[in-house]
């Protein structure tokens, strides 16, 4: 279903997940769409790990996304939802946009379809879900935006389309993931078993020894 949503996009792809890991066929599809259908806008919203955003979206994957032709990337600290849609279908699911989850985990979700044909009914779950996540996206921290501004019709094709880039990576993403910040947040591994004497247990949250 996620595959169908990405492949079937004609105007927009909206990807919401706390964690992104770009590998495999889904990344290839997005690369292909960016090249073959550059007018399709791609919105990406990720979250969690404010002190170290690279745990949610690596720098390599961020750079891959930045290479796409029509892309808007934003960050919401408290994001935990997973939502994927194009202009006519949406998937609310437990699935992170992560290579391991996509290929190994047992996941579930609900598919919603646009009810544009039924303009009378008050029960329009696709539109309500889309509006909610769009509002969440617009309120989120901008990381990177690249869009294309069409040349004026009065230039008679003599002026190329203008690519507009708004890059906040260095002030937002980099600031949160610099070496000093990583050093502050680095924790020593917690031992759950020792080789000498009696075995000891430790709390996985605090690392305190459990008698």
Describe these PLM feature segments.
Residues 2-68, 183-189, 195-199, 209-211:
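Primarily the HKD phosphodiesterase
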Residues 204:
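Cys/His/Pro-rich metal-binding microdomains
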């Amino acid at each position: 279903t996620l595959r169908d949503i990405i492949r079937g996009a004609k105007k927009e792809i909206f990807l919401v997940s706390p964690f992104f890991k770009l590998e495999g066929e889904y990344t290839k599809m997005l690369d292909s769409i960016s090249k073959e259908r550059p007018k399709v806008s791609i919105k990406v919203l990720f979250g969690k790990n404010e002190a170290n955003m690279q745990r949610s979206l690596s720098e390599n994957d961020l750079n891959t996304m930045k290479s796409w032709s029509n892309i808007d990337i934003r960050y919401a600290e408290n994001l935990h939802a997973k939502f994927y849609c194009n202009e006519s279908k949406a998937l609310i699911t437990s699935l992170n946009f992560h290579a391991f989850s996509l290929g190994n985990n047992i996941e579930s979700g609900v598919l919603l379809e646009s009810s544009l044909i039924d303009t009378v009914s008050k029960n329009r779950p696709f539109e309500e879900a889309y509006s909610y996540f769009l509002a969440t996206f617009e309120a989120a921290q901008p990381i990177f935006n690249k869009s294309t501004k069409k040349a004026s019709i009065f230039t008679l094709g003599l002026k190329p389309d203008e690519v507009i880039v708004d890059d906040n990576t260095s002030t937002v993403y980099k600031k949160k993931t610099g070496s000093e910040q990583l050093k502050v947040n680095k924790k020593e591994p917690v031992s759950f078993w020792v080789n000498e004497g009696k075995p000891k247990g430790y709390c996985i949250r605090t690392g305190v020894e459990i008698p």
